[in-house]
């Protein structure tokens, strides 16, 4: 009786082995601790990755914002630097005075002897010409006459010249007849020197009329432009400081 029972059990085991693929497999319950740990680990890992991604994105936005601000600041500073370095086309009165104070030139435009320059205290070219015609005759044909007011007018109306605006301010303030003699200190002589340099050459004979009005202008002209050979002084102005100054060096000619 035991032998048939053993055979039945063995047969049942073989059948079970075939059904299960030859080896028994271990199956975990639905709520196995291992499964719970795996699910929790996966969720926790995903959360950590999300937080890490947020932390990476936030500094990136801040960096972009800071770069934009820094770029704007650099651009503004660059524009300001260009404005400062950009050549000025006009000068104010204060700026001109600073330029004059900074001038260190000690060499005249025309060394002594290159040109023959004379002053005349007569108020116009016509009057000076008439007086000299009587005393010198045809010799005045070689002379070139310069009226400082006309020189200043030339630069006042010279478009885009750096002194155009400033000269027009004085023109409006003092009028066409006297504004040239009310310019900032040194400006009249400076513009005369510029005009001489642009228009005259070695060997020319020149007479500057209605000039100088002060000893300061006289000495400045001789230091910056050229030495003067003579000054023509109407008799009514023979007592002026300018006449007395040139009398001390034997260059005054009373007419």
Curated annotation (Swiss-Prot):
* Subcellular location as annotated: Mitochondrion membrane
Q: How does it sit in the membrane?
A: Single-pass membrane protein
Stretch forming the transit peptide: 1-40
Main localization, broad class: mitochondrion
Q: Which GO terms describe its cellular component?
A: mitochondrial membrane; mitochondrion
Q: Which domain of life is it from?
A: Eukaryota
> What name does the UniProt record give this protein?
Altered inheritance of mitochondria protein 36, mitochondrial
Organism, per UniProt? Saccharomyces cerevisiae (strain ATCC 204508 / S288c)
């Amino acid at each position: 009786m035991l032998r048939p029972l053993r055979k039945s059990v063995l047969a049942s085991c073989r059948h079970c082995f075939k059904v299960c693929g030859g080896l028994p497999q271990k199956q975990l319950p639905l709520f196995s601790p291992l499964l719970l740990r795996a699910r929790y680990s996966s969720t926790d890992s995903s959360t950590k990755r999300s937080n890490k991604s947020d932390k990476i994105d936030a500094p990136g936005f801040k960096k972009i914002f800071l770069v934009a601000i820094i770029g704007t600041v650099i651009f503004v500073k660059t524009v300001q630097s260009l404005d400062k370095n950009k050549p000025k086309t006009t000068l104010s009165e204060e700026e001109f005075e600073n330029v004059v104070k900074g001038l260190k030139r000690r060499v005249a435009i025309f060394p002594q002897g290159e040109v023959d320059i004379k002053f005349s205290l007569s108020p116009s070219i016509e009057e000076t010409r008439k007086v000299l015609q009587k005393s010198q005759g045809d010799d005045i044909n070689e002379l070139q006459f310069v009226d400082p007011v006309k020189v200043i007018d030339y630069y006042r109306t010279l478009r885009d010249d750096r002194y155009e605006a400033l000269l027009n301010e004085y023109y409006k303030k003092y009028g066409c007849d006297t504004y040239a003699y009310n310019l900032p200190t040194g400006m009249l002589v400076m513009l005369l020197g510029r005009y001489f340099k642009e228009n005259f050459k070695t060997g020319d004979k020149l007479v500057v009329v209605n000039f100088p009005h002060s000893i300061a202008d006289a000495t400045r002209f001789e230091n910056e432009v050229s030495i003067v050979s003579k000054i023509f002084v109407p008799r009514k102005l023979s007592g002026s400081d300018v006449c007395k100054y040139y009398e001390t060096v034997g260059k005054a000619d009373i007419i």
